[in-house]
């Protein structure tokens, strides 16, 4: 086998792996993207919070995960942070874009919340928002 053929096989395998991972990611994220606006759930769970505060928090979340700002309405207070992370990074062992570290940094600076200190496997966006409200109040 020539070096050129070997290189083509390696490139085809790498392309296939990237393509497969991207298809898994899109399928996993579709569960979030196909939802109607979750604003009503946020307002029911946090009736005393102004919409602008909730939107600001969700903007931090979608920014940390690298999603478009318009996607913030797709997330519910019951969504687990790790479910979002795993939907974005479906393949174990591949490098990620450090979304959790970015989220932790963006929550600590303005809100004083240490994500890694308070993080549990099942922590939800609503739990994080409640911590922010508690630290502000």
Task: Give, region by region, the residue ranges found by the protein language model.
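Phosphopantetheine-dependent thiolation modules in NRPS/PKS and related acyl-activating systems
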Residues: 2-109, 113-137
């Amino acid at each position: 086998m020539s070096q050129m053929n070997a290189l083509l096989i390696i490139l085809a395998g790498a392309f296939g792996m990237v393509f497969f991972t991207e298809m898994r990611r899109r399928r996993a994220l579709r569960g979030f993207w196909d939802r109607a606006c979750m604003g009503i759930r946020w307002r029911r769970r946090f009736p005393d919070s102004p919409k602008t505060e909730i939107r600001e928090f969700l903007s931090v979340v979608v920014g940390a995960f690298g999603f478009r700002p318009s996607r913030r309405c797709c997330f519910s207070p019951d969504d687990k942070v790790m479910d979002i992370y795993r939907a974005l990074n479906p393949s174990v062992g591949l490098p990620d874009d450090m979304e959790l570290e970015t989220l932790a940094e963006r929550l600590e600076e303005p809100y004083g919340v240490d994500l890694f200190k308070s993080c549990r496997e099942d922590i939800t966006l609503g739990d994080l928002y409640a911590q922010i409200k508690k630290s502000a109040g």
